[in-house]
Amino acid sequence: MKKILALLLVLALSLTLVACGSGKKDAASAGSYKVAMVTDYGDITDQSFNQTTWEAVVAFGKDNNVETKYYKPTSNDTAGRVASVELAIAEGYNVIVMPGYAFGGTIVEVAPNYPDVKFVALDVAKGDLLETAVANKGESYDYNPDNWKLEDYVDLSNVYCAIYQEELAGYMAGY
């Protein structure tokens, strides 16, 4: 019985290794991307969100032979962030990384106009997006995202939002 179990385990492991792939890159290889990061109102030496994000973008670029660049908005408002995102796109960057909830309005204004560009938004929640999207339709937002369907207001199919469960770290730290 032990020999049969060991044989099945070896067979399962060998199939797992075979399934790991041939080492070929898929059709949308990382080399076809140019990644830009737009800072919020800080810069890439803030020892916080912007710096951490920029370091990750640079590491990804080096590991995957992808061109990277960062842009700092000239003003601390949605218009400044929109201008920086549009400049990055005009310069050929097709993946835009944006760290922070301040990009909610920027995403709603820019992403639908550039369906071939991918947007990665860090710490941008549904409510951050809804606030601008609902206002753009002339409606009043009640700050309860569960009452709204974002897709009824704006197409953000080219946007990925990563939300951190900050409450878990707070709990573990005793807060």
Regions found by a protein language model. Name each.
Residues K24-Y175:
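A residue-level marker of the well-folded mature domains of exported/periplasmic proteins
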